[in-house]
Amino acid sequence: MSQSDQPDSSVTQAQAEEAVRTLLRWAGEDPAREGLLDTPRRVAEAYGDWFSGYREEPRAYLERTFEEVAGYDELIVLRDISYESHCEHHMAPIIGKVHVGYLPRGKVVGISKLARVVESYARRFQVQEKMTAQIAQCIQDVLQPRGVGVVVEGAHECMTTRGIHKRGVSMVTSKMLGSFREDARTRAEFLQFIEVGGKR
């Protein structure tokens, strides 16, 4: 985890709660009102959950691998991994799905570990394009497969609840590495497996 990804440990829970009270006053509310008395604490605790990815090292989830997989060297795909993130521009939710595929080179990881990598990157302030690349590069760096493909679908509430107010819009991003980028057949097989936006 880079230094810039580390949470600022000098900021206390009390300071976080006071920041919420400031926002409530700025919005025109009274933080001392009965219904809002516990809101600062609840918001601070929610942020601790939503952004727990800053306290994790995604690569660590992939360190335990299975090298005896009966010679399996074909495509492995985990699709429809649900995630919840927040955009770094408006701090608004991004909700969607991630599809991950890789061609192993002797190392296979437990499927739950791929989902944990997704969660670790999603539970941070994000830009969808960056998150897509981070997930793919993490898998490539640790497992060193012949190729990696990652496709991310996301509904951005910064677009649906503010600004242009367009509901039902989904953003799709992809990152292809190794054989997924160089071999059109491998890429096509992966995309057929996940069938983004299509019927299954």
From Swiss-Prot:
Binding site for Zn(2+): 87, 90, 158
Keyword Amino-acid biosynthesis: no
Entry EC no(s): 3.5.4.16
Gene3D superfamilies documented for this protein: 1.10.286.10, 3.30.1130.10
Biological process terms in GO annotation: one-carbon metabolic process; tetrahydrobiopterin biosynthetic process; tetrahydrofolate biosynthetic process
Database matches in Pfam families: GTP_cyclohydroI
Pathway(s) it belongs to: Cofactor biosynthesis; 7,8-dihydroneopterin triphosphate biosynthesis; 7,8-dihydroneopterin triphosphate from GTP: step 1/1
GO terms of molecular function: GTP binding; GTP cyclohydrolase I activity; zinc ion binding
Catalyzed chemical reaction(s): GTP + H2O = 7,8-dihydroneopterin 3'-triphosphate + formate + H(+)
Keywords associated with the record: GTP-binding, Hydrolase, Metal-binding, Nucleotide-binding, One-carbon metabolism, Zinc
Sequence similarity: Belongs to the GTP cyclohydrolase I family.
Entry-linked NCBIfam families: folE, PRK09347.1-2, PRK09347.1-3
Quaternary context: Toroid-shaped homodecamer, composed of two pentamers of five dimers.
Protein name: GTP cyclohydrolase 1
Originating species: Xanthomonas campestris pv. campestris (strain ATCC 33913 / DSM 3586 / NCPPB 528 / LMG 568 / P 25)
Gene: folE
